[in-house]
Amino acid sequence: MRDRRLGNVDDVAALAELRDREVNYDPSEVRPPEWNFDVHRSLVGCERPGPPEAGGVWEAARDLVRDYEFTPPELIRAVYYRRDPLLGRNLLLEGRFSLLRFYMGVRITALIDETRHQQEKVWGWTYETLEHHLERGNVTYEVVKHLNTGKVEFVASCQSQRSPAVGPVLRMGWRFFGRRTQLRFYRRCGQRLHELVRASLTGTPVSAGAQSPLEMDGLVLVPSGVAPHPLDRFTIRQYNPGR
């Protein structure tokens, strides 16, 4: 299984290449109508009002978000080095659509750990897309506890556009399926996080979430419970789709 956590992809070599890649957009470019701006909120669970409870909903959600366990495996999988600090960590993403597989890099460029307006305890991180990604932009994932009510939310905030370097075939596919799949991804992230938190607090098994992640030599495949499948060799793989 060495070096092949994403089917037939040499993920060790692919991750090494990401070290030299830059973010593929300039913040000054981010403006409507050329870019999409999305905020997706979903309820994770509830605690008593006040600071996050030890071993409670907020802490469970924070740990799952930290490890990128909430990603829906039917749409996105990822490999990264657990030993790398969270800030600056590179992730190799595998985007999955039918028999197509897209391999792209992102980098975590910001961490959030704060209390806002004395009303919300927030923890999260932001990743930005790297050169040759299918998209351009950033996503911020946050776990938010409303201190007055005890409600815990998962918030995904995204600024994105299709990479202009994408070829004509992928451009056509994006026109029909890209935006729809993108929105489905964020909905599924919220659903999965809710299910995983509930499972972690009650001991209820969850498919593709009840097992430990596949890990060798510090390289982790997430979400937990997924592994390369023999049929992966029949998929159509696109490396660096935004080249």
Predicted regions span which residues?
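Acidic, Ser/Thr-rich low-complexity intrinsically disordered segments
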Residues: 204-243
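A conserved amphipathic terminal alpha-helix motif
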Residues: 170-216
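Hydrophobic, Leu/Ile/Phe/Ala-enriched alpha-helical segments that form helix-helix packing faces
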Residues: 61-72, 112-115, 189, 193-201
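Hydrophobic-ligand binding "helix-grip"
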Residues: 99-151
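Hydrophobic ligand-binding cavity/cleft-lining segments
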Residues: 1-98, 229-243
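Beta-strand/loop substructures that line and gate deep hydrophobic ligand-binding cavities in soluble
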Residues: 130-178
